[in-house]
């Protein structure tokens, strides 16, 4: 549940991703996709 909660929190606070920079934003998006893919398998 921790892995699902963290991306969900980040989605609720887009300002945090913007402050972190586009590079960090991209990493989070990829990580979220990987976690969701693993969760569905």
Curated annotation (Swiss-Prot):
Localization annotation: Secreted
Top-level taxon in the UniProt lineage: Eukaryota
GO biological process, one term: hydrogen peroxide catabolic process
Cofactor mode of binding and number, as noted: Binds 1 heme b (iron(II)-protoporphyrin IX) group per subunit. Binds 2 calcium ions per subunit.
GO cellular component, one term: extracellular region
EC number: 1.11.1.7
Reaction(s) catalysed by this chain's protein: 2 a phenolic donor + H2O2 = 2 a phenolic radical donor + 2 H2O
MF-aspect GO terms: lactoperoxidase activity; metal ion binding
Protein known as: Peroxidase 3
Protein's organism: Vitis vinifera (Grape)
């Amino acid at each position: 549940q921790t892995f699902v909660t963290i991306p969900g929190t980040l989605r609720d606070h887009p300002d945090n991703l913007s402050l972190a920079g586009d590079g960090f934003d991209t990493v989070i998006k990829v990580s979220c996709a990987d976690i969701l893919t693993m969760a569905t398998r």
